């Protein structure tokens, strides 16, 4: 995350974020013995980058953003930022992934909600505490287009089909 983002005014969130930034990794930064990841969003009104540490909910290289705000009646401020600017990045350990956040509905939301509650059981209590349906986003990774030099370097002689796909 090359561009410096704004820290949260909330003390515990700011402390978690500062620890991650100082260490250069999310490894070892936890809430209730559960790992967290660090999302970077863009402010809906300010356009400034914002850090959002959230519980780690991951499946097959995709990450969920659960807008629980501890079961508060209102969505967290980052929810509105992501709705306005869905280009988001996530740091997991020392790896950073960029993608597009998409709010989930129906069966897909139910699936990711199950994963979220398994990763951090208090989410279930938060949902009981509020009248709003807690939103869940999934971060869809950006496609990675390999340069021919990278493919040749990483993979000895791609087959004809792969070579054709790479040229297209």
Tell where the protein language model's regions lie, with residue ranges.
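Residue-level detector of beta-strand face positions
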Residues: 38-40, 89, 138
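Short secondary-structure boundary/capping segments
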Residues: 28-29, 55, 80
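Polybasic, low-complexity association/targeting segments
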Residues: 1-10
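Short beta-strand segments
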Residues: 33-70
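Short, structured beta-strand-loop surface elements
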Residues: 68-123, 129-133, 141-143
């Amino acid at each position: 995350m090359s561009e410096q983002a704004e820290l949260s005014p909330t003390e515990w969130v700011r402390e978690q974020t500062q620890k991650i930034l100082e260490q250069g990794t999310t490894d070892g930064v936890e809430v209730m013995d559960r790992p967290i990841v660090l999302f970077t969003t863009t402010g809906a009104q300010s356009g400034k980058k914002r850090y959002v540490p959230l519980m780690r909910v991951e499946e097959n290289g995709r990450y969920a953003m659960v807008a629980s705000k501890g079961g508060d009646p209102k969505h967290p401020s980052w929810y509105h930022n992501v709705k306005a600017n869905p280009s988001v990045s996530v740091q997991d350990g020392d790896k950073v992934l960029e993608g597009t956040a998409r709010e989930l509905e129906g069966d897909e939301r139910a699936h990711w909600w199950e994963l979220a509650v398994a990763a951090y059981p208090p989410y279930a209590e938060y949902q009981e505490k509020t009248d709003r349906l807690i939103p869940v986003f999934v971060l869809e990774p950006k496609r990675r287009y390999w340069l021919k030099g990278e493919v040749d370097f990483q993979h000895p002689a791609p087959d004809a089909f792969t070579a054709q796909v790479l040229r297209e």
